[in-house]
UniProtKB/Swiss-Prot annotation:
Keyword Secreted: yes
Keyword vocabulary terms for this entry: Neuropeptide, Secreted
Protein name: Extended FMRFamide-10
Organism classification: Eukaryota, Metazoa, Ecdysozoa, Arthropoda, Hexapoda
GO CC, alphabetical: extracellular region
Any single biological process term in GO: neuropeptide signaling pathway
Annotated source species: Austrophasma gansbaaiense
Family note: Belongs to the FARP (FMRF amide related peptide) family.
Amino acid sequence: PAPETNYLRDP
């Protein structure tokens, strides 16, 4: 699976 959830994406 692709780790594109919100591990490094914090607005």
